[in-house]
Amino acid sequence: MKVYCLLLVLLVGLVSQAHGQLDKKCQMVCTMDYRPVCGSDGRTYPNKCTLTSTACMSQRSITVFHDGEC
């Protein structure tokens, strides 16, 4: 039982560390300019920077499908 608890604690620590590294990698300062773009996921983003940031944080490949709202 103690071994399982120790493994669980280690696993939680590793996941937390990986998430922290992802946050640092994906940190972007996006302006509040509203220049909507339609993402390849069918969602409208306020601007290209927001789309890029969302793609990085979600670890998905989202590209600009076209300018303007979807």
Swiss-Prot record:
According to the record, the segments passing through the membrane are none
Disulfide topology:
26-56, 30-49, 38-70
Cell compartments where the protein resides: Secreted
**One Pfam family, short name:** Kazal_1
What is the tissue localization of expression for this protein?
Expressed by the venom duct.
Domain-related comment: The cysteine framework is IX (C-C-C-C-C-C).
Return the protein name: Turripeptide Gsg9.2
Q: What is the lineage of its organism?
A: Eukaryota, Metazoa, Spiralia, Lophotrochozoa, Mollusca
